[in-house]
Regions:
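Basic/polar N-terminal segments that are highly enriched at the extreme N-terminus
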Residues: 1-21, 25, 397-398
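Generic structural signal for well-ordered, non-transmembrane alpha-helical segments
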Residues: 21-24, 252-255, 290-297, 331-338, ...
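C-terminal helix-coil-helix/basic helical segment that borders enzyme active sites and/or dimer interfaces
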Residues: 31, 35-38, 297-332, 342-353
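Short, structured patches in soluble enzyme cores that scaffold and shape functional sites
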Residues: 134, 145, 160-163, 175-178, ...
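DPxDG-like acidic metal-binding loop motif
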Residues: 144-187, 196
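Glycine-rich beta->alpha junctions and the first turn(s) of the following alpha-helix
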Residues: 191, 197-296
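Glycine-rich phosphate/cofactor-binding loops in nucleotide/flavin-utilizing enzymes
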Residues: 348-398
Length: 398
């Protein structure tokens, strides 16, 4: 294990709380860079530098490889605050922070190889649009994945594949260096425009078996015997962590929209074609603002509940009910966060539809991310309802 980094870089904060403090100080800069992030259609280079130096991508990595192995509440708050400043940047960080856990779930030889990568940033997709053909002690992977968020900023890629002859076992996640992946610069979207969610293409890439794991095992928390086997932090169902780790980005967008609304409210003048000379004095706006705040507070509570749910399976196996709850909660947090942002946008003036107004970005971004297949509330509600009714879940993302 000599190749693995055992300590934090000299510039990094000493604690996860230190990471949060640095991120809190960056929120304003992230927001100021958001228009350029959208124009670039990828992470602003200054954001990537600042967040890397702040230690963000090490948050959930093992301590023996220079990570913080941070608690759920700290990870959630860091990711929410990044999204508060820039939703696109927050979502890319979410993907890479969560996926940087994957090597700790693999055999030691794979973990050592991947965690030896300086400034590790992993991206992943569970959409099974590739094929992994078994060869002696390995797989040869070919495929195309259309939703590789932040792939151009990563150094490892973890796509899910169908394996001929293993259909009864389900999908297999494979890990390969991003240097072996070609990205098609195709991401042009109405929202989350800066996430570099491009097509990733792989052609006959050799992946040792140690760098693979069944998606069903990730869902159930079944991992090979390894150095981290006795560490509860890395023994929980990873798919459940995807749900718990993704929710804060949605909450952060609602916080950011509230920031923008409250910053402009004191200087807003008349509500056109009404008798109100100051928007802040209008009863209608008071009702709209109260409703938005209720939605924000509810999203905060459900995000805390989801973190507590995941923390609660540190020492006891997760039940299928808990896994279904995690799947449903992220959708509910998405609905609450979107309701908050949409209410605030409705309460804003027509001038806030201009691209120079920050709130319109949160409006576009939350409505686009709400459509994400792994977040979409109707799917999560169905899974949760089935389990409540005594049926098996009908989704692999549980």
């Amino acid at each position: 294990m000599s190749a693995v980094l055992r300590s934090l870089p000299s510039h990094a904060p000493r604690t996860a709380e230190g990471v949060l403090a640095e991120v809190n100080a960056l929120v304003g800069q992230l927001r100021a860079r958001a228009p350029e992030t959208e124009r670039l259609r990828r992470m602003h280079p200054d954001n990537l530098r600042d967040l890397t130096e702040a230690g963000v991508f090490r948050l959930a990595m093992p301590t023996d490889v220079g990570g913080y192995q941070a608690g759920e509440d700290i990870v959630a708050e860091v990711l929410a605050q990044i999204s508060r400043g820039c939703p696109s940047t927050g979502w890319m960080c979410t993907i890479m922070v969560v996926a940087n856990v994957i090597p700790a779930l693999l055999a030691d030889e794979a973990a050592d190889e991947i965690y030896a990568t300086p400034d590790l940033r992993t991206t992943a997709t569970i959409a099974p649009t590739g094929q992994a053909v078994p060869v002696d002690g390995a797989y040869r992977v070919t495929g195309q994945w259309t939703w590789n968020t932040a792939g151009v900023h990563s150094n490892w890629f973890a796509p899910a594949c169908v394996v001929p002859g293993e259909e009864d076992w389900g999908l297999r996640l494979t890990l390969m260096p991003t240097a072996e992946v070609e990205h098609q610069d195709n991401w042009r979207a109405a929202g989350m425009a800066g996430t570099a969610t491009n097509i990733a293409m792989v052609n006959d890439v050799f992946v040792p078996s140690a760098r693979t794991i069944l998606v069903n095992d990730l869902a159930d928390g079944r991992y090979p015997a390894r150095r981290y086997s006795g560490v509860p932090y890395f023994s929980r169902p990873f798919v459940m962590y995807i749900n718990a780790g993704s929710a804060p980005a949605l909450l952060g967008m609602a916080r950011g929209a509230m920031d923008c609304f409250m910053q402009t409210l004191p200087t807003r003048g008349a509500i056109t074609y009404t008798g109100w000379s100051k928007a802040a004095e209008a009863p209608l706006l008071h009702h709209q603002l109260a409703k938005a705040q209720y939605h924000l507070e509810a999203a905060e509570m459900f995000t805390s509940r989801l973190s507590a749910l995941y923390r609660g399976v540190l020492h006891t196996p997760a039940t299928i009910m808990e896994r279904a709850q995690a799947r449903a909660y992220i959708g509910h947090i998405a609905s609450l966060s979107r309701a908050c942002v949409n209410q605030l946008f409705e309460a804003s003036s027509a001038s806030h539809t201009l691209l120079a107004a920050d709130i319109q970005r949160y409006f576009r971004d939350i409505n686009v991310l709400h459509q994400h297949a792994a977040i979409q509330p109707n799917s999560g509600d169905e899974v949760y309802g089935r389990v409540l009714a005594g049926l098996e879940p009908n989704s692999e993302i549980v």
